[in-house]
Amino acid sequence: MLDIQQLRNDLDNVVARLSSRGFAFDINAFIALENERKTVQTRTQDLQAKRNATSKQIGIAKSRGEDVASIMAEVAGLGAQLKEGEERLAAIQAELQQLLLSVPNLPHESVPVGKSEEDNVEVRRVGTPRRFDFDVKDHTDIGTPLGLDFDTGAKLAGARFTLMRGQIARLHRALAQFMLDTQTEQHGYTECYTPYIVNADSLRGTGQLPKFEADLFAAQKGGQEGESNEAFYLIPTSEVTLTNTVRDEIVPLDSLPIKLTAHTPCFRSEAGSYGRDTRGMIRQHQFDKVEMVQITHPERSYDALEEMVGHAEHVLQALGLPYRVVLLCTGDMGFGAAKTYDLEVWLPAQNTYREISSVSNCEAFQARRLQARFRNENGKPELLHTLNGSGLAVGRTLVAVLENNQQADGSVVVPEVLRPYMGGLTVISAQQ
């Protein structure tokens, strides 16, 4: 959430920066609410001062033996007006809060201005795509004989769900374990096991609610506990749970940075993706991801962003997968991000790079919603900065391994770093 003081003091600049990411801020609604807030606040303060002064007259009149009935009636009337003003002021503040909850983050000055992914800027490419001397298959055709079962997934749950069996299920698990071990043992993250179901407050804190409720899977408790109708949701990413660990907390300065990671399933309705990537595992309602979260001092968050990109790259390099790093433009960034890098892996069957990780600095945008703070050198509470990124999306990494490591006979070479997790297997094939 944006700082309302920044809107009050620098409205034109904020509106222009929001416009650069394709967001039209409702200036008229904001100004109308602000003008009413100022009017009501001034009137309320005047009423409070008048009531205090009038209340003092009661004591003076009583000491003189005078009748105080009229003064007490006036105080009561002022009290009623004051209550009415305070209630209206609270309602205005709530309306301003709702308005701000729908406003995205301001892009950092280093983010290129653009409208769509076509305006993103390639930063670097790493690795050379392999030249094949046979007809390349996509991951669906490679994976089906190896235990990738889309038909049973659809029978169990519907479209965009997958069942895995045997060695391909083991390879999927090996990828997740390798990613977790890399992030914890080499990059200093603390592994967490988190709930897969969260309340609405958690999703508001990280920015999924209220704007993106259609992208979520809602859940409800059964039995007597379900009678409260409290809203619960399946997590779209463990960014939600990991970042919310500091909600309503003031953390010690010497505990920063806080570096957390988790391997969880992620659940997304893909409401805006009808008809896109309907074949295979690229866009699923349920997929696994190893998430990285850093919670940092504001002065260090952009160093942390570059560091986290490197942590995600390390996994791709260890697996021997060609990829590129892309700096997203203002119009292609996620709602809460001030700056985002995407890592895109090479998929031979599509003859293109596809996103496999997104790493973002949200600055204080989430922390303001979460009231996540630290005590600075002067002992004063100050908002933290939060960052998140995939380290990596497990299903898409499996897709990349299948396609890049495929052999002419339909088998797949297991990346060397995964072989200890695969019982020493060097190849998986249908014959196994």
Curated annotation (Swiss-Prot):
Any one GO molecular function term: ATP binding
PROSITE patterns associated with the record: AA_TRNA_LIGASE_II
Enzyme Commission number(s): 6.1.1.11
UniProt superkingdom: Bacteria
The protein's enzyme class: ligase
Reactions it catalyzes: tRNA(Ser) + L-serine + ATP = L-seryl-tRNA(Ser) + AMP + diphosphate + H(+); tRNA(Sec) + L-serine + ATP = L-seryl-tRNA(Sec) + AMP + diphosphate + H(+)
Compartments (UniProt record): Cytoplasm
Entries under Pfam families matching the protein: Seryl_tRNA_N, tRNA-synt_2b
Keyword tags: Aminoacyl-tRNA synthetase, ATP-binding, Cytoplasm, Ligase, Nucleotide-binding, Protein biosynthesis
Coiled-coil features, chain-numbered ranges: none
GO biological process: selenocysteine biosynthetic process; seryl-tRNA aminoacylation
Positions contributing to ATP binding: 268-270, 355-358
Family per similarity comment: Belongs to the class-II aminoacyl-tRNA synthetase family. Type-1 seryl-tRNA synthetase subfamily.
Subunit structure and binding partners: Homodimer. The tRNA molecule binds across the dimer.
Summary of the function given for this chain in its UniProt record: Catalyzes the attachment of serine to tRNA(Ser). Is also able to aminoacylate tRNA(Sec) with serine, to form the misacylated tRNA L-seryl-tRNA(Sec), which will be further converted into selenocysteinyl-tRNA(Sec).
PANTHER family the UniProt entry points to: SERINE--TRNA LIGASE, SERYL-TRNA SYNTHETASE
Domain remark in the UniProt entry: Consists of two distinct domains, a catalytic core and a N-terminal extension that is involved in tRNA binding.
Name this polypeptide is given: Serine--tRNA ligase
